[in-house]
C-alpha cells in the first residue's frame, strides 16, 4: 500500500492516542521501504532499514503502533519476546527461530490472499468432492436418458448444497492427516521435520471420517488449496515479502540487557542472546520452510521499559544496529480519557456492544468517563504503571455487578454516571493495599 508518512500517522491516530514521535519515526521507516523498492536492484541491496528502539513502559502503545501498521499494509509481522530466547548451546529457542516464524507468517499471509483470489475455484472443488459422495458418478455405457436424469438430479443437489439445506446431513470423506498436526505439544521447530517427512512420504496418510457437510466444507479447504493453488509460486512470493516487507517486533529487549549495577549469574546468558541476535539484525541467511531467507532488509523494532537497565547496557554492536530511538510518553488522565473516547472501537464502545447482546443499552456520561480516567491514572501513579491496560481492570470492576445481572435490565437503558464510578471504585482507590490486589 502506497501511503505517505502523513497518511500513515493519520491512520494510526484512529487507534493509538498521542505518541506522535513514535508514529512519525515508524511512518518514515515504512515509507523508506517503498522508496527503496523504486530504485535500481544494485542500489536496493545497499540501502538497509534503520531499525527502531522504542523506550516506554507497558501499555503506552508500542506494540499496537507496529501491529496496526503491519496489518493495514499487509506486511508479514511477528511479535516476539527477547526474554524467551536462550544462547545457542542452552536448552530453549534460539534466535533464528524468530526468522522462521516470520517466514511462516509470510506464507500464511500469501496463502490467504491466494485463497481469497481463487475462492470460486476452491468452492467449486469442495462442492464437486461433496457431490461425488452424495451422488456417485454413473458407470460407463449408461443410456442418454439415464445420464440426463443424473445431470438433473446433480444440479438439484448442487442448489440444495449451495443454499445450505444439506449442511446437517452426514457424509464420509477422505482427508489427509499429518501425524505432526495432531499433537499440539510439539515445538514450532518441528516444522523443518514436517517438510522432510512430506518429501519422503512418511507421516501423512489418508483417513476416512464421518462428519456433517458443513464441517466437511472446512475440512476440504486445505486439500482444495493444495490442489488448485501454485504452491511454489506462493513460497516464492512469501520469501520475497518476508525479506523486503517483514517486520520483527522484539519486545522486552531490556530484559536481556546486562545492567552495570546488577550483575548475576544469568548475565553471561543474556549477553549471549544479544550476540546471537546481532548477525540476524545485521543481515544473515536463515534456512526456513520457504527457502533461504536473507534478513538484510527486515525491519526490526525493539521495545522495552528499561526500568532496571538502560539502552546503553546493551552490547555496543547491538546498540549500533538500532540507530532510531524514540521515548514514548506515559499516559496521564487526559490521554486515558482520549483512549476511552476517540478510537474507532474504544473500550467503552466494546463494553456497550457486548451488553447490547443482552438487549441492554449502556451509556457513559462525560463526567463518568473523566472519573474513570482519573482513577486509572492515579492507580498507575501509586502502583506499577501499566498504561492503558489499567483501564481494562478499572472498567471490569466498575461493570462487574451490571454484567452479572444484565438479564434483569433487558430492554432498558443504563447510564453510568460519576456518582456510580465513585461508589464502585472510590473506596478501593483510597485503600492502597486493597487497590494493589483489585486494580
UniProtKB/Swiss-Prot annotation:
Residues given in the record as ATP binding sites: 17, 59-64, 251, 317, 389
A single BP term in Gene Ontology: protein unfolding
Predominant localisation class: cytoplasm
A Pfam family matched in the record: AAA_2
Keyword set, alphabetical order: ATP-binding, Chaperone, Cytoplasm, Nucleotide-binding
Molecular function GO terms recorded: ATP binding; ATP hydrolysis activity; peptidase activity; proteasome-activating activity
Protein name (record): ATP-dependent protease ATPase subunit HslU
Organism: Campylobacter jejuni (strain RM1221)
Gene giving rise to this polypeptide: hslU
Amino acid at each position: 500500500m502506497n501511503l505517505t508518512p502523513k497518511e500513515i500517522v493519520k491512520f494510526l491516530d484512529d487507534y493509538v492516542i498521542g505518541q506522535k514521535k513514535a508514529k512519525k519515526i515508524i511512518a518514515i521507516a515504512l515509507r523508506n521501504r517503498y522508496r527503496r523498492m523504486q530504485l535500481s536492484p544494485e542500489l536496493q541491496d545497499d540501502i538497509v532499514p534503520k531499525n527502531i528502539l522504542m523506550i516506554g513502559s507497558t501499555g503506552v502503545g508500542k506494540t499496537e503502533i507496529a501491529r496496526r501498521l503491519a496489518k493495514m499494509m499487509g506486511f508479514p509481522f511477528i511479535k516476539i519476546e527477547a526474554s524467551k530466547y536462550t544462547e545457542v548451546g542452552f536448552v530453549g529457542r534460539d534466535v533464528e527461530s524468530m526468522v522462521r516464524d516470520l517466514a511462516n507468517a509470510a506464507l500464511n499471509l500469501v496463502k490467504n490472499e491466494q485463497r481469497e483470489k481463487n475462492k470460486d475455484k476452491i468452492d467449486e472443488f469442495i462442492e464437486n468432492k461433496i457431490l461425488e459422495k452424495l451422488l456417485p458418478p454413473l458407470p460407463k455405457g449408461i443410456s442418454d436418458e439415464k445420464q440426463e436424469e443424473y445431470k438433473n438430479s446433480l444440479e438439484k443437489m448442487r442448489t440444495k448444497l449451495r443454499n445450505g439445506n444439506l449442511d446437517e446431513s452426514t457424509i464420509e470423506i477422505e482427508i489427509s492427516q499429518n501425524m505432526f498436526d495432531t499433537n499440539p505439544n510439539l515445538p514450532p521447530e518441528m516444522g523443518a521435520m514436517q517438510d522432510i517427512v512430506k518429501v519422503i512420504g512418511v507421516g501423512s496418510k489418508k483417513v476416512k471420517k464421518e462428519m456433517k457437510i458443513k464441517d466437511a466444507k472446512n475440512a476440504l479447504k486445505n486439500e482444495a488449496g493444495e490442489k488448485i493453488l501454485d504452491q511454489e509460486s506462493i513460497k516464492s512470493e512469501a520469501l520475497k515479502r518476508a525479506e523486503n516487507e517483514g517486520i520483527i517486533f522484539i519486545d522486552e529487549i531490556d530484559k536481556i540487557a546486562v545492567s552495570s549495577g546488577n550483575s548475576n549469574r544469568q548475565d553471561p546468558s543474556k549477553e549471549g542472546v544479544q550476540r546471537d541476535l546481532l548477525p540476524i539484525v545485521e543481515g544473515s541467511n536463515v534456512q526456513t520452510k520457504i527457502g533461504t531467507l536473507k534478513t538484510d532488509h527486515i525491519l526490526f523494532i525493539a521495545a522495552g521499559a528499561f526500568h532496571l537497565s538502560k539502552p546503553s547496557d546493551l552490547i555496543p554492536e547491538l546498540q549500533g544496529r538500532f540507530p532510531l530511538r524514540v521515548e514514548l510518553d506515559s499516559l496521564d488522565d487526559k490521554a486515558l480519557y482520549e483512549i476511552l473516547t476517540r478510537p474507532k472501537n474504544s473500550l467503552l464502545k466494546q463494553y456497550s456492544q457486548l451488553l447490547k447482546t443482552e438487549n441492554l443499552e449502556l451509556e457513559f456520561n462525560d463526567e463518568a468517563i473523566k472519573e474513570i480516567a482519573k482513577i486509572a491514572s492515579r492507580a498507575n501513579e501509586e502502583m506499577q504503571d501499566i498504561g492503558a491496560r489499567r483501564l481494562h481492570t478499572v472498567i471490569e470492576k466498575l461493570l462487574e455487578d451490571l454484567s452479572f445481572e444484565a438479564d434483569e435490565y433487558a430492554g432498558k437503558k443504563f447510564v453510568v454516571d460519576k456518582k456510580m464510578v465513585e461508589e464502585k471504585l472510590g473506596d478501593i482507590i483510597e485503600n492502597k493495599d486493597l487497590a494493589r490486589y483489585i486494580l
